């Protein structure tokens, strides 16, 4: 529709403000000469196949990751959200709980991390994180998945073991379907 008037104009103005605020935050990050940021991919489609015991054919999974970057040697898989996201939305204290509806944001970015590691044959030679930039919570910056039950002592690095536990739980769900 026409973005010069009415509701469409308001939505457009909000989107412009979100983008400008985000870019200002990125610029601020880069004013510190110690920070090294490389954007490796945007809007990248990733795919792989899962072999599940008891299912006679491979299950294809895919997703489109908003951004892959490297910040100070840490590879980050990033999803942008226009809505409100807080760090508690990305806390994964137990992989078995990843069936719960409120865990969908963590599930999404962990799935992107899994897809990235499989489709790019990633060997975990550098730290890996997955998380969200929430445009309604930009002051919190990049919100990574946190595997710690103690918010004061975060555990945000994704290892191959953590991804295997994650995908094991997803395979259990697929077997039930």
Regions found by a protein language model. Give the residues of each.
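Structural signature of nuclease core domains in nucleic-acid processing machines
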Residues: 1-177
